[in-house]
């Protein structure tokens, strides 16, 4: 079994060795390279497919040979540098390949593609075969450049640097490619054979008959493919024809002669060097360290890449003339034909590739992006030679130059094994020394030495003379971190006076060592100038440098002209000539031939690395149009912004001398299309841009698929869960509403598609927009002034002919009301009489507002409100239309034509109503007559003839009566005729029975069509009532008469007939009441609603006023009393002055100033926050603010409240958490329980070592102080500034409150200190020690202790993010005023708010240039208090957003005086306030607090709550205060904390001071007239936002918001916008609910719902260096709750029970037993410094006994090896008294090449081009208990 396993293991290892061998890997990569098929296969396949016969066979062979030869040359070029440079020159393809392709295409296009002329039997003489060979060879060489090589082919270049035998790898990869190519060609041959043998294809007669035509067609297909390749290739080359040249004015600096000096070169070129063979094709190697020192800085940078004739050369390889002058180069006056051709055609300083221009807000040029850290070079790592791809290019170049001049024999003799052994021995020696030192320090602690003497201190430089004072931290080269600074060199005036300015410009200093190292330098100039100097003796101290010169001379003696001394002079060391030359070499300065005198210069030149920068400084299109660019920049932009149309919406009418285009206001209308320009530079080849894909119809931000993981909605799985839930419940509750919404959406989509089709139809017409615009203008004029007046005239003439009164006035009033507004193509209103810019090209729309419709008659205006309300509800039609080219009107641009209101429809409707009414009346009469006739015939006993006569008589009588009303004379004649034929008896009877009672209500005429619906109902009811009454009276009389004639009737019949009239009377009464109720109901309802509204609102006003007044009075009284009692106890004498001042200040309280800081902190607050909607938070916030402001307070009475673990009854949880976070209160730890945390062995191990938490006194001694500038020789100097209250550890409150008198404390404010420690401690603790489960909570308190309305879960039920996102989970920034901005992390997934528009529109008294140009030479202690804010607008009370408060650079709490603070002139009168809510008009001072304080009461800074402050800003001399204008994405306010480099004199002339610009902008932008104020008011309110809204979140809000914005733009351009505003509101075009959207959706709610995101302004808060010292000394931070203190050591401690993730610094932890001198174990973090700590870790990991452990992860190694590598731990087994297990220290160290990988990843993650961020990649050890 053992043998089998052994053989199996050998077999596996053998297979692994074979697989990892160079040959197999080369074959594999070569085979994969076969799939890199490009245009070179075009000629090869053509020869294989089309050629036939013997000549065809020869052509196939020649094509294959040329193809393989070309591929072999490409593989050789990978290793052979000259061939690679020859094929990889940037302009080779432009000069050679493109003309060859075009010539080949046009030459073969006019003749038969396969006709190569006459052929002979001799193949070598056949020109066609040679052409085939050359074509395949050349195309294979060009294949690498025509199309980008595939990823598989690029892998060859990567593996080249990982194998040792490179030539074997190249050969094997070529063989692999050849095998793959043969297989591919065999497959093609099999396919062709199958096609030829296929009967279905061969039997086609058409193909057989037209074989020659088919061949010609195939030839044409190949020609077309070749032409497409040429066209596609045209866009990928750096062509000088299509490349846009940047203007010379765009270059950085103020001179235009930058391009001429460096472009000159000679024909001499270094060949065959090792640098060429290694072939750095895409790197920009820095030059030698000994480059020219006084080269013009405005010229090209030293590290810039210079390509001439395709050879990448550094500046060292050029030949310059020796004598050049600053600002006056020799080649300044060259003409264009005197320059080299390539430098004339191609500008190497500009962007040919589609690179992104990274904005630089400083006055510097942009860093070149292609200067990456990927530079391959061999170096020694871990004692062995390895290839590093992050090697400094400048160092490699300098090393090669040194190696060419001198040999290093000592290093060459040693082998690699000996070097490695030496390296191991050195590391072991260092390891032993560190272990001994470490053990000595531990033993010293056990013997009882003072802890500060045991801890390792950082080495400092001191004064050599006195040895008493340290060198200042800034100038100490030993210190690291922020203490490292650049010393600003200054030349005394006496030295400057010695050197005249002319001589200073003419002289040029040349370094002599640089002259020695460069081979092409003329050394004869040296010999001519030796006699200028005096002969002095040679210094004996510098003899070792002389030997170096001798070695240089011997190594370079073979070269001509490089011999420094003659052979005779080389023998003696002390020869005079050698001494003379040595002095000349070190001290001499070459001068110009015109001036042979030696000039002295007292300028210190230090070695520094210059960052490679571009020669141009470009501006974006947005900056150019907004006027935010600097004065020194060009007049045109170079960076393309997002495509948009600028619409001028306001232009000043009165133009003064100072008025310019900048005063115009414009609206940017962005087209709804993807932004593929992406901040590209003009002239860059956009075709070369790859990695940008299109995966949906409209992409707002086009980006690479590499960033798809940062998108919230994935393209394939995008589900809006809340919206789906809403639709589900909506459909469950009611099916009809869901169907209705669905149908409306479908109709909208159909309308949009139809409008798109109409718009696309215009594109087929030549000049579509111009044609359509002219037609629209003609249609508008025709409609307004011809068509409509003609219709009005015809209508009124017709009314006159029909005997109706004309309506000239009404019609022409409506005609005048119709307005035609000219809009842009997208519908943005511009003006009524002015055409927009470029309207002839872009097109216009004409919007008809209040369109005129011809009506047959006009309704009466004197109508009741009820009827008008009903008519308005009935006639809800759009009040505007867009005019079409055919004269019709549409509601949308290019929409469908809706039906017009008809002129004859009301007339027909009125006739139909009258006909229906007449018909109904006739039917009623017939029905009544029928019923009465039937009843009468049943009851009466008379004959039918008598009854018919009586009925006819009554009917004739009724007709007579009606006729009498119409014409009395005709009735009189009829009456006489009738009376002549009747007897007197019947006449008397008829006269007696003809009386008919009229109604008691006067009936109006039914012909009046102006009666309302209510009047008609009343009239109908009155008619019916009067008719019924008449009938009942008539029936009663008839019954009474019949009863008298017949005698007494029966009882039953009499009672039945008696009840019927009673019932009729009751019905009459009910109808009468209903009539009155109908008439009075509407008025009653309106009066009732108004009365209730007034009563309730008055009560609300009185309650709010009384409560607010009582609240403020009680607060003032309580705190005045409290301050009075306290001051009487402490200092009775100063009470009167203080109280009087405070009372005066409280009277000057202004609530408007508090809203500024509140709204600013809203923008920086988190999303998941708790909301408070009760006003009691105001009083509690004020109470505890006052408590925290007092210097010393005894909180014994409040201690029980704060230490209560349950739900507090008298204190809100948020306020308690606030004071616990601020460090004011601390509660007990004994009731705190750990929830959902897994305790690892590191925490358990630290529980037994609590004794090593130093006390506050000792930690305060560790913190450096200002007076500790002397060297501590005998021990630590006692701190004399400590008082009793500071050393009393139990009373921590005194320590917190006496900061002003406590001089030892390093930071100026406890809050800032606590914040920094809180964030850094938490981050470091989580990164090293924490093991948090996915179900863990990060909040204030556990979920079980909080109720539903008290949870403040900042990461509650949220997926755990990366470790770097832990800073977002810290809720402490809700409670801080300053210093919290720099610690906020920006989420890259967000769409950020465009602050450019906000800041551009929000400022009224600002000069834009003042923000961009600041004074570098600011004075000391410059006060920028109130005067700094005069340039900003007064914010309105109802404003949506507010400005940012500029925080202090450094605060002085002692000098802060509570003065009335007029922040940004906020106490001025607000211009034209419009109250959108009535309840806010009664409380104008509470308007800012209306929506802010309810949501988050803690975000309002306590210092601005009920008092005002006057903040000061003290700017020191070394601090620069800059404001910069924002880019397209965001604004940066950067506070520079470092010294700038020396600027040029011309550059300083271009900068203006901040104070001068501030005075100018006050005078320039002052408001003078009322119209301007109205425009600013409108602009401030409704034109301050630009957001991206998701339609799924708030449906229909986007469209309504955009429509409102368009109306705002149109209103800004009007002189009197009030009337138009009212009319826009009436026609529902201006939505009032969006105007007051801030009352419905606060900024926090909008942020939560994802409508828009605000990017907070980053302020670089000054970072004090004391905190860095604390990080160095106390790295191991452990939370107090992680300790389990024994009972005998338990003392009173203060801890926050609600914050489980809070880490407290070590020096704040109270020591349980200070006099205890027993120490168990000390970790390296507590003793050694950071540098020594890292050194110890690395040396411990380098174990010479186990060589394999260097490149492996030691965590997976054997534990025995770990125990042996850490011997000092084995000796301390007895130290851990609580645990019996052994403590083992496991170190995790990555190999060196992994660190290089991290350094390369560094460039991607941090977007840096240098190694400044490499310090982030520090790997700390992990401690584990075995």
Curated annotation (Swiss-Prot):
The keyword Nucleus does not apply. Pfam families: Ycf1 (PF05758). GO terms for biological process: protein transport. One of its GO terms (cellular component) is chloroplast inner membrane. The keyword Ribosomal protein does not apply. InterPro entries: TIC214. Involved in protein precursor import into chloroplasts. May be part of an intermediate translocation complex acting as a protein-conducting channel at the inner envelope. Part of the Tic complex. Belongs to the TIC214 family. This is Protein TIC 214. It comes from Daucus carota (Wild carrot).
């Amino acid at each position: 079994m053992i043998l089998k396993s052994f053989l199996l293991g050998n077999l596996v290892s053998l297979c692994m060795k074979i697989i990892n061998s160079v040959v197999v890997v080369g074959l594999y990569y070569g085979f994969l390279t076969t799939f890199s098929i490009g245009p070179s296969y075009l000629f090869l396949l053509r020869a294989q497919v089309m050629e036939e016969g013997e000549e065809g066979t020869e052509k196939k062979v020649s094509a294959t040979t040329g193809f393989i030869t070309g591929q072999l040359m490409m593989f050789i070029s990978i290793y052979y540098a000259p061939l690679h440079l020859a094929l990889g020159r940037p302009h080779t393809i432009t000069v050679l390949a493109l003309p060859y392709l075009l010539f080949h295409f046009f030459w073969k296009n006019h003749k038969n593609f396969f006709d190569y002329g006459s052929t002979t039997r001799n193949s070598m003489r056949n020109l066609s075969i040679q052409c085939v060979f050359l074509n395949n060879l050349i195309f294979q060489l060009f294949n690498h450049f025509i199309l980008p090589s595939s990823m598989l082919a690029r892998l060859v270049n990567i593996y080249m640097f990982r194998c040792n035998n490179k030539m074997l790898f190249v050969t094997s990869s070529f063989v692999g490619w050849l095998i793959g190519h043969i297989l591919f060609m065999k497959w093609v041959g099999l396919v062709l054979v199958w096609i030829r043998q296929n009967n279905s294809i061969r039997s086609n007669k058409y193909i057989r008959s037209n074989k020659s035509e088919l061949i010609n067609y195939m030839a044409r297909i190949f020609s077309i493919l070749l032409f497409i390749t040429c066209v596609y290739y045209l866009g990928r080359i750096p062509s000088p024809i299509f490349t846009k040249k940047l203007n010379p004015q765009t270059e950085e600096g103020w001179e235009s002669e930058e391009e001429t000096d460096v472009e000159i070169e000679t024909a001499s070129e270094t060949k065959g060097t090792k640098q060429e063979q290694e072939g750095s094709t895409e790197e920009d190697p820095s030059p030698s360290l000994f480059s020219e020192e006084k080269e013009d800085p405005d010229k090209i940078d030293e590290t810039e890449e210079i390509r001439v004739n395709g050879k990448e050369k550094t500046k060292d390889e050029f030949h310059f003339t020796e004598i050049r002058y600053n600002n006056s180069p020799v080649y300044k006056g060259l003409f264009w034909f005197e320059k080299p051709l390539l430098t004339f055609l191609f500008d190497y300083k500009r962007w040919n590739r589609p690179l992104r221009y990274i904005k630089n807000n400083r006055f510097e040029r942009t860093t070149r992006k292609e200067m990456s850290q990927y530079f391959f070079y061999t170096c020694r790592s871990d004692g062995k030679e390895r290839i590093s791809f992050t090697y400094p290019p400048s160092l490699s170049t300098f090393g090669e130059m040194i190696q060419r001049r001198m040999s290093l024999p000592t290093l060459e003799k040693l082998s690699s094994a000996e070097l490695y052994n030496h390296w191991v021995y050195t590391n072991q020696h260092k390891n032993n020394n560190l272990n001994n030192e470490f053990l000595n320090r531990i033993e010293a602690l056990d013997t009882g030495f003072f802890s500060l003497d045991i801890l390792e201190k950082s080495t400092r430089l001191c004064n050599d003379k006195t040895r008493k004072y340290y060198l200042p931290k800034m100038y100490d080269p030993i210190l690291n971190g922020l203490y490292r600074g650049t010393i600003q060199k200054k030349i005394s005036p006496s030295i400057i006076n010695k050197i005249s300015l002319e001589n200073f410009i003419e002289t040029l200093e040349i370094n002599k060592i640089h002259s020695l190292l460069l081979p092409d330098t003329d050394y004869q100039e040296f010999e001519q100038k030796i006699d200028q100097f005096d002969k002095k003796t040679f210094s004996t101290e510098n003899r070792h440098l002389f030997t170096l010169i001798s070695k240089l001379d011997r190594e370079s003696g073979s070269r001509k002209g490089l011999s420094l001394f003659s052979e005779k002079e080389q023998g003696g060391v002390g020869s005079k000539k050698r001494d003379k030359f040595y002095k000349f070499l070190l001290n001499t300065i070459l001068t110009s031939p015109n001036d042979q005198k030696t000039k002295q210069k007292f300028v210190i030149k230090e070695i520094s690395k210059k960052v490679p920068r571009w020669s141009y400084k470009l501006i974006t299109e947005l900056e150019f149009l907004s006027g935010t660019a600097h004065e020194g920049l060009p007049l045109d932009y170079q960076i393309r912004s997002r495509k948009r149309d600028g619409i001028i919406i306001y232009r000043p009418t009165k133009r003064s001398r100072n008025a310019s285009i900048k005063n115009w206001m414009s609206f940017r209308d962005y087209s709804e299309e993807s932004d593929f320009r992406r901040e590209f530079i003009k002239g860059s080849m956009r075709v070369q841009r790859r990695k940008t894909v299109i995966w949906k119809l409209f992409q707002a931000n086009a980006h690479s698929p590499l960033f798809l993981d940062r998108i919230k909605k994935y393209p394939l799985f995008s589900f809006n869960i809340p919206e789906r839930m809403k639709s589900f419940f909506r459909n469950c509750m009611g099916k009809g509403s869901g169907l209705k919404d669905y149908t409306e959406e479908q109709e909208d989509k159909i309308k949009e598609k139809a409008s798109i089709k109409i718009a696309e139809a215009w594109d087929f017409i030549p000049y579509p927009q111009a044609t359509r615009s002219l037609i629209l203008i003609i249609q508008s004029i025709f409609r307004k002034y011809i068509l409509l007046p003609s219709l009005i005239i015809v209508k009124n003439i017709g009314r006159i002919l029909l005997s109706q009164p004309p309506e000239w006035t009404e019609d022409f009033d409506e005609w005048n009301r119709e307005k035609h507004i000219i809009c842009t193509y997208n519908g943005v209103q511009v003006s009524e009489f002015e055409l927009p810019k470029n309207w002839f090209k872009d097109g216009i729309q004409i919007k008809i507002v209040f369109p005129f419709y011809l009506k047959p008659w006009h309704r009466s205006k004197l109508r009741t409100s009820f009827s008008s309300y009903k008519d308005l509800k009935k006639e809800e039609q759009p009040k505007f239309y867009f005019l079409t080219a055919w004269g019709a009107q549409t509601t949308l641009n290019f929409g469908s034509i809706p039906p017009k209101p008809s002129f004859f429809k009301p007339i027909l409707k009125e006739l139909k109503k009258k006909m229906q009414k007449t018909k109904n009346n006739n039917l009623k009469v017939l029905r009544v007559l029928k019923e009465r006739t039937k009843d009468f015939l049943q009851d009466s006993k008379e004959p039918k003839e008598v009854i018919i006569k009586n009925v006819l008589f009554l009917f004739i009588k009724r007709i007579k009566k009606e006729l009498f009303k119409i014409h009395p004379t005709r009735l009189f004649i009829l009456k006489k005729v009738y009376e002549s034929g009747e007897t007197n008896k019947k006449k008397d009877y008829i006269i007696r029975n003809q009386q008919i009672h009229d109604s008691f209500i006067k009936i109006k005429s039914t012909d009046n069509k102006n009666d309302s619906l209510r009047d008609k109902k009343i009239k109908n009811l009155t008619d019916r009532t009067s008719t019924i009454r008449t009938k009942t009276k008539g029936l009663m009389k008839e019954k009474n008469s019949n009863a008298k004639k017949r005698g007494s009737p029966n009882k039953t019949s009499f009672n039945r007939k008696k009840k019927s009239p009673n019932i009729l009377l009751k019905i009459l009464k009910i109808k009468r009441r209903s009539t009155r109720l109908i008439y009075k109901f509407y008025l009653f309802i309106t009066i009732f609603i108004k009365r209730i509204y007034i009563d309730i609102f008055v009560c609300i006003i009185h309650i709010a006023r009384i409560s607010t007044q009582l609240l403020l009075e009680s607060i003032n009284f309580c705190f005045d009393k409290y301050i009075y009692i306290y001051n009487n106890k402490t200092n009775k004498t100063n009470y009167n002055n203080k109280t009087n001042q405070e009372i005066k200040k409280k009277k000057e309280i202004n609530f408007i100033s508090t809203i500024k800081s509140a709204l600013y902190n809203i923008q920086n607050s988190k999303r998941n926050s708790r909301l408070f909607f009760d006003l009691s938070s105001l009083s509690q916030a004020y109470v505890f603010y006052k408590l925290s402001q007092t210097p010393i307070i005894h909180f014994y009475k409040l201690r029980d409240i704060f230490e209560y673990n349950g739900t507090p009854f008298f204190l809100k949880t948020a306020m308690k958490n606030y004071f616990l976070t601020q460090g004011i209160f601390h509660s007990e730890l004994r009731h705190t329980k750990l929830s959902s945390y897994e305790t690892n062995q590191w925490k358990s191990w630290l529980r037994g070592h609590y004794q090593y938490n130093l006390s506050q006194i000792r930690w305060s001694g560790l913190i450096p102080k200002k007076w500790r500038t002397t060297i501590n020789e005998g021990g630590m100097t006692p701190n004399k500034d400590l008082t009793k209250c500071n050393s009393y550890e139990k009373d921590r409150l005194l320590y917190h409150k006496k900061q002003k008198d406590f001089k030892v404390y390093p930071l100026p404010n406890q809050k800032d200190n606590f914040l920094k420690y809180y964030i850094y401690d938490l981050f470091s603790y989580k990164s090293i020690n924490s093991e948090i489960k996915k179900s863990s909570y990060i909040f204030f308190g556990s979920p079980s202790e909080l109720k539903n309305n008290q949870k403040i879960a900042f990461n509650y039920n949220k997926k755990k993010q990366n470790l770097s996102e832990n800073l977002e989970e810290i809720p402490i920034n809700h409670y801080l005023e300053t210093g919290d901005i720099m610690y906020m992390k920006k989420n890259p997934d967000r769409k950020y708010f465009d602050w450019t528009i906000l800041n551009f529109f929000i400022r009224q008294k600002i000069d834009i240039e003042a923000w961009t140009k600041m004074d570098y030479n600011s004075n000391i202690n410059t006060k920028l208090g109130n005067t700094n804010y005069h340039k900003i607008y007064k914010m309105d009370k109802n404003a949506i957003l507010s400005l940012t408060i500029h925080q202090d650079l450094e605060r002085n709490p002692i000098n802060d005086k509570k003065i009335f603070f007029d922040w940004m002139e906020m106490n001025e009168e607000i211009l034209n306030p419009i109250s959108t809510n009535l309840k806010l008009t009664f409380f104008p001072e509470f308007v800012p607090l209306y929506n802010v304080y309810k949501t988050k009461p803690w975000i309002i800074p306590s210092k601005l709550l009920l008092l005002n402050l006057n903040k000061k800003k003290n700017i020191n001399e070394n601090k620069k205060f800059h404001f910069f204008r924002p880019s397209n994405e965001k604004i940066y306010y950067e506070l520079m904390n470092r010294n700038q480099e020396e600027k040029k004199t011309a550059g300083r002339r271009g900068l203006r001071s901040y104070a001068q610009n501030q005075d100018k902008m006050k005078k320039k932008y002052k408001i003078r007239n009322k119209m301007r104020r109205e425009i600013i008011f409108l602009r401030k309110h409704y034109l301050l936002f630009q957001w991206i809204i998701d339609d799924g979140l708030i449906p229909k809000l986007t469209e309504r918001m955009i429509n409102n914005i368009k109306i705002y733009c149109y209103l800004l351009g009007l002189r009197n916008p009030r009337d138009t505003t009212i009319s826009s509101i009436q026609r529902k075009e201006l939505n009032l609910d969006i105007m007051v959207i801030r009352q419905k959706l606060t900024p926090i709610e909008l942020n939560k719902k994802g409508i828009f995101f605000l990017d907070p302004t980053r302020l670089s808060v000054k970072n004090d260096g004391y905190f860095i010292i604390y990080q160095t000394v106390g790295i191991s931070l452990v939370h107090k709750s992680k300790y389990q203190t024994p009972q005998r050591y338990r003392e009173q401690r203060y801890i926050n029970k609600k914050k489980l993730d809070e880490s407290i610094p070590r020096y704040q932890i109270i020591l349980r037993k200070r006099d205890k001198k027993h120490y168990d174990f000390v970790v390296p973090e507590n003793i050694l410094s950071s540098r020594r700590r890292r050194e110890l870790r690395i040396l411990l990991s380098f174990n010479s006994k186990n060589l394999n452990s260097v490149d492996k992860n030691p965590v997976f190694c054997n534990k025995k090896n770990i125990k042996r590598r850490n011997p000092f731990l084995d000796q301390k087994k007895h130290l851990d008294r609580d645990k019996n297990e052994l403590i083992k220290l496991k170190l995790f160290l990555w190999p060196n090449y992994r660190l290089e990988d991290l350094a390369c990843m560094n460039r991607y993650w941090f977007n840096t081009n240098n190694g400044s961020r490499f310090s982030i990649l520090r790997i700390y050890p992990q401690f584990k208990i075995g």
